Amino acid sequence: MKGKHRVGLGALVLVLLMATVAYPVLLYTDNAFVSKWRTLYIETAMSTMSHQWLATAFIPQSIIDEVMQTRAETTELQRTAESTWNVGDVTSAIVESEEIEDDEERFYTLFNELDKKSFESYLEDHEDVLEKGWDRIAIDKCDEESDTGIRTKQGDTVLAISAKQGILIVAVKGETYRGRLAIVKDASRVELKTCEELFDVGQYIKDIAKDEDAILAINASGFIDADGVGNGGTPYGYLKVAGKELQGPYEHGYKIVGFDEDDLMQIGDSNITDNLWDAVEFGPALMVDGESKLKSASSGWGLQPRTAIGQAADKTVLMLVIDGRSTRSAGAT
Protein backbone atom coordinates (compact mmCIF):
# COMPACT_ATOMS: atom_id res chain seq x y z
CA MET A 1 0.00 0.00 0.00
CA LYS A 2 2.84 2.38 0.85
CA GLY A 3 4.33 1.82 -2.61
CA LYS A 4 1.06 2.80 -4.25
CA HIS A 5 0.83 5.91 -2.07
CA ARG A 6 4.37 6.92 -3.08
CA VAL A 7 3.55 6.45 -6.78
CA GLY A 8 0.40 8.52 -6.40
CA LEU A 9 2.27 11.25 -4.53
CA GLY A 10 5.01 11.27 -7.16
CA ALA A 11 2.47 11.69 -9.94
CA LEU A 12 0.82 14.55 -8.05
CA VAL A 13 4.18 16.30 -7.57
CA LEU A 14 4.93 15.91 -11.29
CA VAL A 15 1.58 17.44 -12.24
CA LEU A 16 2.15 20.35 -9.85
CA LEU A 17 5.63 20.94 -11.28
CA MET A 18 4.22 21.01 -14.81
CA ALA A 19 1.51 23.43 -13.74
CA THR A 20 3.91 25.78 -11.95
CA VAL A 21 6.90 25.58 -14.31
CA ALA A 22 5.93 24.28 -17.77
CA TYR A 23 2.69 26.26 -18.06
CA PRO A 24 4.30 29.71 -17.52
CA VAL A 25 7.18 28.76 -19.82
CA LEU A 26 4.81 27.77 -22.62
CA LEU A 27 2.88 31.01 -22.19
CA TYR A 28 5.70 33.53 -21.94
CA THR A 29 8.86 32.07 -23.48
CA ASP A 30 10.40 33.71 -26.55
CA ASN A 31 11.73 30.37 -27.79
CA ALA A 32 11.05 30.38 -31.55
CA PHE A 33 9.64 26.85 -31.68
CA VAL A 34 7.31 27.29 -28.69
CA SER A 35 6.28 30.79 -29.77
CA LYS A 36 5.38 29.59 -33.27
CA TRP A 37 3.11 26.78 -32.09
CA ARG A 38 1.59 28.85 -29.28
CA THR A 39 0.64 31.52 -31.81
CA LEU A 40 -0.80 28.98 -34.26
CA TYR A 41 -2.78 27.30 -31.47
CA ILE A 42 -4.33 30.59 -30.35
CA GLU A 43 -5.07 31.77 -33.89
CA THR A 44 -6.62 28.46 -34.90
CA ALA A 45 -8.87 28.30 -31.84
CA MET A 46 -9.93 31.95 -32.09
CA SER A 47 -10.81 31.54 -35.78
CA THR A 48 -13.54 29.01 -35.01
CA MET A 49 -17.15 29.78 -34.14
CA SER A 50 -17.60 27.33 -31.26
CA HIS A 51 -14.15 26.32 -30.04
CA GLN A 52 -12.60 29.61 -28.94
CA TRP A 53 -12.74 28.27 -25.38
CA LEU A 54 -9.76 26.06 -26.24
CA ALA A 55 -7.72 29.25 -25.97
CA THR A 56 -9.72 31.45 -23.60
CA ALA A 57 -10.11 28.74 -20.93
CA PHE A 58 -6.48 28.82 -19.83
CA ILE A 59 -4.57 31.47 -21.80
CA PRO A 60 -4.60 35.06 -20.44
CA GLN A 61 -6.61 37.48 -22.56
CA SER A 62 -3.60 39.80 -22.84
CA ILE A 63 -1.62 37.09 -24.66
CA ILE A 64 -4.58 36.27 -26.92
CA ASP A 65 -5.01 39.96 -27.78
CA GLU A 66 -1.32 40.32 -28.59
CA VAL A 67 -1.41 37.33 -30.94
CA MET A 68 -4.63 38.41 -32.63
CA GLN A 69 -3.28 41.92 -33.23
CA THR A 70 -1.66 40.62 -36.42
CA ARG A 71 -5.12 40.02 -37.87
CA ALA A 72 -6.01 43.68 -37.34
CA GLU A 73 -2.72 44.74 -38.93
CA THR A 74 -3.37 42.50 -41.93
CA THR A 75 -6.87 43.96 -42.28
CA GLU A 76 -5.26 47.40 -42.49
CA LEU A 77 -2.90 46.20 -45.24
CA GLN A 78 -5.89 44.83 -47.14
CA ARG A 79 -7.47 48.28 -47.42
CA THR A 80 -4.97 49.35 -50.08
CA ALA A 81 -4.78 46.00 -51.89
CA GLU A 82 -5.78 46.56 -55.51
CA SER A 83 -4.37 45.06 -58.70
CA THR A 84 -3.20 47.42 -61.45
CA TRP A 85 -2.23 45.16 -64.34
CA ASN A 86 -3.89 45.07 -67.76
CA VAL A 87 -3.81 43.00 -70.93
CA GLY A 88 -0.73 44.86 -72.17
CA ASP A 89 1.30 43.47 -69.27
CA VAL A 90 0.96 39.78 -70.17
CA THR A 91 1.52 37.18 -72.86
CA SER A 92 -0.72 34.13 -72.78
CA ALA A 93 0.90 30.73 -72.20
CA ILE A 94 -1.62 29.31 -74.68
CA VAL A 95 -0.64 31.79 -77.41
CA GLU A 96 3.09 31.21 -76.86
CA SER A 97 2.74 27.44 -77.22
CA GLU A 98 0.49 27.66 -80.29
CA GLU A 99 3.23 29.51 -82.18
CA ILE A 100 5.52 26.45 -81.96
CA GLU A 101 5.23 23.81 -84.72
CA ASP A 102 6.98 20.86 -83.05
CA ASP A 103 4.46 18.93 -80.89
CA GLU A 104 6.94 17.94 -78.18
CA GLU A 105 8.41 21.41 -77.88
CA ARG A 106 4.92 22.91 -77.80
CA PHE A 107 3.96 20.55 -74.95
CA TYR A 108 6.96 21.50 -72.81
CA THR A 109 6.45 25.18 -73.56
CA LEU A 110 2.82 25.01 -72.44
CA PHE A 111 3.59 22.98 -69.32
CA ASN A 112 6.78 24.84 -68.45
CA GLU A 113 6.37 23.84 -64.79
CA LEU A 114 7.32 20.22 -65.61
CA ASP A 115 10.71 18.78 -64.80
CA LYS A 116 11.53 17.39 -68.24
CA LYS A 117 13.89 14.63 -67.05
CA SER A 118 11.34 13.11 -64.65
CA PHE A 119 8.62 13.21 -67.32
CA GLU A 120 10.87 11.52 -69.87
CA SER A 121 11.52 8.75 -67.34
CA TYR A 122 7.77 8.31 -66.91
CA LEU A 123 7.29 8.07 -70.68
CA GLU A 124 9.95 5.36 -70.92
CA ASP A 125 7.95 3.22 -68.49
CA HIS A 126 4.54 4.14 -69.95
CA GLU A 127 4.91 4.14 -73.74
CA ASP A 128 1.12 4.08 -74.22
CA VAL A 129 0.88 7.69 -73.00
CA LEU A 130 2.13 8.93 -76.38
CA GLU A 131 -0.03 6.65 -78.53
CA LYS A 132 -2.33 9.55 -79.53
CA GLY A 133 0.41 12.16 -79.70
CA TRP A 134 1.78 14.89 -77.47
CA ASP A 135 -1.37 16.98 -77.76
CA ARG A 136 -3.47 14.10 -76.38
CA ILE A 137 -1.35 13.16 -73.37
CA ALA A 138 -3.72 12.25 -70.54
CA ILE A 139 -2.50 11.09 -67.12
CA ASP A 140 -4.76 11.04 -64.05
CA LYS A 141 -3.53 9.54 -60.77
CA CYS A 142 -5.39 11.94 -58.46
CA ASP A 143 -7.60 9.27 -56.91
CA GLU A 144 -4.79 6.77 -56.43
CA GLU A 145 -2.50 9.21 -54.59
CA SER A 146 0.45 7.17 -55.87
CA ASP A 147 3.83 8.66 -56.67
CA THR A 148 3.96 9.05 -60.44
CA GLY A 149 7.63 9.97 -60.32
CA ILE A 150 6.81 13.05 -62.38
CA ARG A 151 8.00 16.26 -60.73
CA THR A 152 7.65 19.97 -61.22
CA LYS A 153 10.78 22.07 -61.39
CA GLN A 154 10.13 22.89 -57.72
CA GLY A 155 10.08 19.19 -56.80
CA ASP A 156 6.34 18.68 -56.23
CA THR A 157 4.68 15.46 -57.40
CA VAL A 158 2.54 15.75 -60.54
CA LEU A 159 -0.69 13.74 -60.26
CA ALA A 160 -2.44 14.61 -63.51
CA ILE A 161 -1.73 16.10 -66.93
CA SER A 162 -4.26 16.77 -69.66
CA ALA A 163 -2.71 18.25 -72.78
CA LYS A 164 -6.12 18.59 -74.43
CA GLN A 165 -7.61 20.49 -71.48
CA GLY A 166 -4.41 22.39 -70.67
CA ILE A 167 -4.47 21.33 -67.01
CA LEU A 168 -1.77 20.13 -64.64
CA ILE A 169 -2.59 18.91 -61.10
CA VAL A 170 0.12 18.81 -58.45
CA ALA A 171 0.23 17.36 -54.93
CA VAL A 172 1.34 19.94 -52.38
CA LYS A 173 2.34 19.23 -48.81
CA GLY A 174 4.04 20.86 -45.87
CA GLU A 175 4.65 20.36 -42.18
CA THR A 176 0.95 20.68 -41.29
CA TYR A 177 -0.96 20.27 -44.54
CA ARG A 178 -1.71 18.33 -47.70
CA GLY A 179 -3.55 19.57 -50.76
CA ARG A 180 -3.81 19.88 -54.52
CA LEU A 181 -2.82 22.65 -56.90
CA ALA A 182 -4.50 22.79 -60.30
CA ILE A 183 -2.60 24.74 -62.95
CA VAL A 184 -4.99 25.87 -65.69
CA LYS A 185 -3.37 27.22 -68.85
CA ASP A 186 -6.41 28.74 -70.55
CA ALA A 187 -7.88 31.42 -68.28
CA SER A 188 -10.87 31.89 -70.59
CA ARG A 189 -12.18 28.49 -69.46
CA VAL A 190 -12.44 29.51 -65.80
CA GLU A 191 -16.03 30.49 -65.01
CA LEU A 192 -18.01 31.26 -61.87
CA LYS A 193 -21.08 29.09 -61.27
CA THR A 194 -23.65 29.05 -58.48
CA CYS A 195 -25.80 26.45 -56.74
CA GLU A 196 -29.08 25.63 -58.47
CA GLU A 197 -31.25 27.20 -55.75
CA LEU A 198 -29.15 30.30 -55.07
CA PHE A 199 -30.16 32.26 -51.92
CA ASP A 200 -32.22 29.27 -50.81
CA VAL A 201 -30.27 26.00 -50.50
CA GLY A 202 -26.62 25.27 -51.21
CA GLN A 203 -25.03 22.40 -53.13
CA TYR A 204 -21.86 20.35 -52.88
CA ILE A 205 -19.17 21.40 -55.34
CA LYS A 206 -19.20 17.98 -56.99
CA ASP A 207 -22.90 18.38 -57.77
CA ILE A 208 -22.49 21.87 -59.22
CA ALA A 209 -19.58 20.59 -61.34
CA LYS A 210 -21.72 17.72 -62.62
CA ASP A 211 -24.61 20.06 -63.46
CA GLU A 212 -22.27 22.37 -65.37
CA ASP A 213 -20.32 19.56 -67.06
CA ALA A 214 -17.13 20.92 -65.49
CA ILE A 215 -13.92 18.90 -65.26
CA LEU A 216 -12.46 20.91 -62.36
CA ALA A 217 -14.08 22.93 -59.56
CA ILE A 218 -13.21 24.62 -56.25
CA ASN A 219 -15.03 26.83 -53.74
CA ALA A 220 -15.33 30.47 -54.75
CA SER A 221 -16.26 32.20 -51.47
CA GLY A 222 -17.82 31.69 -48.07
CA PHE A 223 -21.51 31.55 -47.29
CA ILE A 224 -23.78 33.08 -44.68
CA ASP A 225 -23.84 30.74 -41.67
CA ALA A 226 -26.26 32.36 -39.20
CA ASP A 227 -25.88 30.83 -35.72
CA GLY A 228 -23.82 28.03 -37.23
CA VAL A 229 -26.81 26.42 -38.93
CA GLY A 230 -26.67 27.98 -42.41
CA ASN A 231 -27.49 25.80 -45.41
CA GLY A 232 -24.95 27.31 -47.80
CA GLY A 233 -27.50 28.89 -50.11
CA THR A 234 -26.41 32.52 -49.70
CA PRO A 235 -22.82 33.46 -50.55
CA TYR A 236 -20.96 35.98 -48.44
CA GLY A 237 -20.70 39.38 -50.06
CA TYR A 238 -20.48 40.51 -53.66
CA LEU A 239 -21.57 38.17 -56.45
CA LYS A 240 -21.46 38.74 -60.19
CA VAL A 241 -21.91 35.92 -62.70
CA ALA A 242 -21.53 36.23 -66.48
CA GLY A 243 -21.75 40.01 -66.26
CA LYS A 244 -24.89 40.03 -64.10
CA GLU A 245 -24.68 41.42 -60.56
CA LEU A 246 -26.60 39.13 -58.20
CA GLN A 247 -25.61 40.57 -54.81
CA GLY A 248 -23.96 43.76 -53.59
CA PRO A 249 -20.73 44.02 -51.57
CA TYR A 250 -20.53 43.71 -47.78
CA GLU A 251 -17.13 45.45 -47.55
CA HIS A 252 -16.38 44.16 -44.04
CA GLY A 253 -12.64 44.13 -44.65
CA TYR A 254 -12.86 41.59 -47.48
CA LYS A 255 -11.78 42.12 -51.09
CA ILE A 256 -13.59 41.61 -54.37
CA VAL A 257 -11.83 39.23 -56.75
CA GLY A 258 -12.87 38.27 -60.24
CA PHE A 259 -12.01 38.05 -63.92
CA ASP A 260 -12.42 40.85 -66.43
CA GLU A 261 -13.26 40.45 -70.12
CA ASP A 262 -9.55 40.02 -70.92
CA ASP A 263 -9.46 36.98 -68.59
CA LEU A 264 -7.24 38.81 -66.11
CA MET A 265 -7.88 38.24 -62.41
CA GLN A 266 -8.42 41.55 -60.63
CA ILE A 267 -8.51 42.34 -56.90
CA GLY A 268 -9.95 45.43 -55.29
CA ASP A 269 -13.07 46.98 -53.81
CA SER A 270 -16.49 47.90 -55.18
CA ASN A 271 -14.91 50.45 -57.54
CA ILE A 272 -13.61 47.65 -59.81
CA THR A 273 -16.87 45.71 -60.23
CA ASP A 274 -17.96 47.41 -63.48
CA ASN A 275 -14.96 45.90 -65.26
CA LEU A 276 -15.48 42.35 -64.01
CA TRP A 277 -17.33 39.51 -65.73
CA ASP A 278 -17.33 37.02 -62.84
CA ALA A 279 -16.61 38.08 -59.26
CA VAL A 280 -17.00 37.18 -55.58
CA GLU A 281 -16.02 38.79 -52.28
CA PHE A 282 -13.77 37.15 -49.70
CA GLY A 283 -10.25 37.31 -48.37
CA PRO A 284 -7.63 37.97 -47.44
CA ALA A 285 -5.73 38.89 -50.58
CA LEU A 286 -2.38 37.13 -50.24
CA MET A 287 -0.38 38.78 -53.01
CA VAL A 288 -1.33 41.64 -55.31
CA ASP A 289 0.88 42.65 -58.23
CA GLY A 290 3.62 40.44 -56.81
CA GLU A 291 3.61 42.01 -53.33
CA SER A 292 2.50 40.34 -50.10
CA LYS A 293 -0.54 41.84 -48.39
CA LEU A 294 -0.15 39.88 -45.14
CA LYS A 295 1.40 41.00 -41.87
CA SER A 296 2.71 37.49 -41.18
CA ALA A 297 2.38 33.98 -42.60
CA SER A 298 -0.70 33.18 -40.51
CA SER A 299 -1.91 36.77 -39.99
CA GLY A 300 -4.16 35.82 -37.09
CA TRP A 301 -6.01 32.96 -38.78
CA GLY A 302 -3.96 29.95 -37.69
CA LEU A 303 -4.12 26.53 -39.31
CA GLN A 304 -7.26 26.10 -41.40
CA PRO A 305 -8.50 24.33 -44.53
CA ARG A 306 -7.86 26.69 -47.43
CA THR A 307 -9.04 27.47 -50.93
CA ALA A 308 -7.12 30.00 -53.01
CA ILE A 309 -6.99 31.23 -56.58
CA GLY A 310 -4.30 33.21 -58.33
CA GLN A 311 -2.95 34.08 -61.74
CA ALA A 312 0.59 34.12 -63.08
CA ALA A 313 2.06 36.72 -65.40
CA ASP A 314 1.32 34.53 -68.45
CA LYS A 315 -2.40 34.30 -67.46
CA THR A 316 -2.04 30.75 -66.12
CA VAL A 317 -4.65 30.29 -63.37
CA LEU A 318 -3.65 28.60 -60.10
CA MET A 319 -6.39 26.89 -58.09
CA LEU A 320 -5.34 25.58 -54.67
CA VAL A 321 -7.24 23.45 -52.15
CA ILE A 322 -5.78 22.51 -48.74
CA ASP A 323 -7.41 19.91 -46.51
CA GLY A 324 -7.74 20.79 -42.83
CA ARG A 325 -8.93 19.89 -39.35
CA SER A 326 -7.94 16.25 -39.73
CA THR A 327 -5.14 14.04 -38.43
CA ARG A 328 -3.82 13.76 -41.97
CA SER A 329 -3.81 17.50 -42.61
CA ALA A 330 -4.34 20.07 -39.85
CA GLY A 331 -4.42 22.91 -42.35
CA ALA A 332 -2.26 25.74 -43.64
CA THR A 333 -1.56 29.29 -42.48
Label every model-predicted segment.
Residues 3-247:
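Zymogen propeptides
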Residues 176-181, 253-254, 303-308:
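Short glycine-rich loop/turn motifs
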Residues 183, 215-219, 258, 310, ...:
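Structural recognition of the beta-strand scaffold that forms the well-ordered cores
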Residues 184-188, 258-264, 289, 311-315:
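Short acidic-glycine loop/turn motifs at beta-strand connectors
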Residues 188-189, 222-226, 273, 300, ...:
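Solvent-exposed loop/turn segments at secondary-structure junctions
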Residues 197-201, 271-275, 322-326:
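Short, solvent-exposed aromatic-acidic interface loops
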Residues 223-298:
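Active-site-adjacent helix-turn-beta-strand microarchitecture at beta-sheet edges
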Residues 288-333:
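Domain-core and long-helix interface of multi-subunit machines
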